[in-house]
Amino acid sequence: MKQATRKPTTPGDILLYEYLEPLDLKINELAELLHVHRNSVSALINNNRKLTTEMAFRLAKVFDTTVDFWLNLQAAVDLWEVENNMRTQEELGRIETVAEYLARREERAKKVA
């Protein structure tokens, strides 16, 4: 596992601090622009929901950005969470490569033959 770094900024934080606050947009106003329920926007901003591809398309349209901008923010957070989750790293450490598996299978076959 690599050394822990600061968690990347979430799409919700970017949305709040780089878009809503500077533009003086309220959650319900953004929800109206996005054609989604207010709770969807609120959950994203409060980091209670991950950004979906569909929402990335909607945000890109509303703010004239790229879909990749939003998806890359979420991907960075997702990668950080996996890389810094000890339990997940332990599980990943038990996974063998296909080359290791094939070598082990070949060794077993030699012993049987």
From Swiss-Prot:
Pfam families: HTH_3. The lineage of its organism: Bacteria, Pseudomonadati, Pseudomonadota, Gammaproteobacteria, Enterobacterales. InterPro entries: Cro/C1-type_HTH, Lambda_DNA-bd_dom_sf, Toxin_antidote_HigA. GO terms for molecular function: DNA binding. Residues 27-46 bind DNA. The keyword Glycoprotein does not apply. It comes from the Bacteria. The keyword Transmembrane does not apply. SMART domains: HTH_XRE. Residues 16-70 form the HTH cro/C1-type domain. CDD domains: HTH_XRE. This is Uncharacterized HTH-type transcriptional regulator YbaQ. Keywords: DNA-binding, Transcription, Transcription regulation. Belongs to the VapA/VapI family. NCBIfam families: antidote_HigA (TIGR02607).
